[in-house]
């Protein structure tokens, strides 16, 4: 855990057990298929597809699975599903705002599974717009520190549209408008700086501080939501102090 700044609203990482790993593989493969359908099957001409393939490889998804998903999405191979993106929103315990990104081929199933996970874990689904106004989609790029200074990174990306460079301990995090994400990545490559991760994320303008027990309730809710194959990402507006993070690290 890199500190409460990273935990404020970012996606909650899953435990790397076999069941979770299998679900994570399925979601990464789904993203490849959708990216290929939207922008074509050539990664060199489709930055989103290129990103999704890199993420899948980093997570050790087998190359055969990656290639089949790319072909299904581009139409080179039959069998692709009609994936539809849906965003659900609502509140968890302690008034925490929750955004749930889904990618599904069955709207009714997705809605039922999300509603069940929320209601069983102290949450409630809200109307469209009930919490999304608290979040802003933000481009996020992370680079490993190594010998780099914050100024090194800032100089490399400032003219590409970067807004901030934050020190998260082992990595520097660069924020930008989602539309500037590719330009920021290109600027880093030109400067010889290796990219650790890049994505668009939701960041909250209003944060809810929680104690350890409150955090555990939210983590249980997030885990229940992410157990659904249709749920891609879950975002919250919690913020955790260093003391709470230290207490949580003692949990098994």
UniProtKB/Swiss-Prot annotation:
GO cellular component, one term: cytosol
Main location: cytoplasm
GO MF entry, a single one: DNA binding
NCBIfam families assigned to the protein according to its UniProt record, in alphabetical order: PRK00110.1, PRK12378.1, YebC/PmpR family DNA-binding transcriptional regulator
Keywords from the named record: Cytoplasm, DNA-binding, Transcription, Transcription regulation
HAMAP family: Transcrip_reg_TACO1 (MF_00693)
Organism: Corynebacterium efficiens (strain DSM 44549 / YS-314 / AJ 12310 / JCM 11189 / NBRC 100395)
Gene Ontology biological-process annotations: regulation of DNA-templated transcription
Xref: PANTHER family: TRANSCRIPTIONAL REGULATORY PROTEIN YEBC-RELATED (PTHR12532:SF6), TRANSLATIONAL ACTIVATOR OF CYTOCHROME C OXIDASE 1 (PTHR12532)
Protein localization: Cytoplasm
Family of the protein in this entry: Belongs to the TACO1 family.
Domain of life: Bacteria
Disordered: annotated span: 1-22
Protein name: Probable transcriptional regulatory protein CE1776
Taxonomic lineage: Bacteria, Bacillati, Actinomycetota, Actinomycetes, Mycobacteriales
Entry-linked InterPro entries: Integrase-like_N (IPR017856), TACO1_YebC-like_2nd/3rd_dom (IPR048300), TACO1_YebC_N (IPR049083), Transcrip_reg_TACO1-like (IPR002876), Transcrip_reg_TACO1-like_dom3 (IPR026564), YebC-like (IPR029072)
């Amino acid at each position: 855990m890199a500190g409460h700044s990273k935990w404020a609203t970012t996606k909650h990482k899953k435990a790397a057990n076999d069941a979770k790993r299998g679900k994570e593989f399925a979601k990464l493969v789904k993203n490849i298929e959708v990216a290929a359908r939207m922008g074509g099957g050539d990664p060199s001409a489709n930055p989103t597809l290129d990103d999704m393939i890199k993420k899948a490889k980093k997570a050790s998804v087998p190359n055969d699975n990656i290639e089949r998903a790319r072909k299904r999405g581009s139409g080179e191979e039959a069998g692709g599903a009609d994936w539809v993106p849906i965003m659900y929103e609502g509140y968890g315990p302690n008034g925490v705002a929750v955004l749930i990104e889904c990618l599904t081929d069955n709207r009714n199933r997705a809605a039922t599974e999300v509603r069940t996970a929320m209601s069983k874990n102290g949450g409630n689904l809200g109307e469209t717009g009930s919490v999304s106004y608290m979040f802003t989609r933000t481009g996020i790029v992370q680079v490993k520190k190594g010998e780099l200074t914050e100024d090194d990174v800032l100089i490399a990306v400032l003219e590409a549209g970067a807004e901030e460079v934050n020190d998260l301990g082992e990595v520097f995090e660069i924020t930008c408008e989602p539309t500037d994400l590719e330009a920021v990545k290109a600027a880093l490559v030109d400067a010889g700086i290796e990219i650790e991760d890049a994505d668009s994320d939701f960041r909250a303008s209003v944060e809810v501080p929680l104690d350890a027990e409150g955090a555990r309730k939210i983590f249980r809710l997030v885990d229940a939501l992410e157990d659904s194959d249709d749920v891609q990402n879950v975002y919250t507006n919690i913020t955790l102090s260093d003391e709470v993070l230290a207490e949580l690290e003692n949990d098994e």
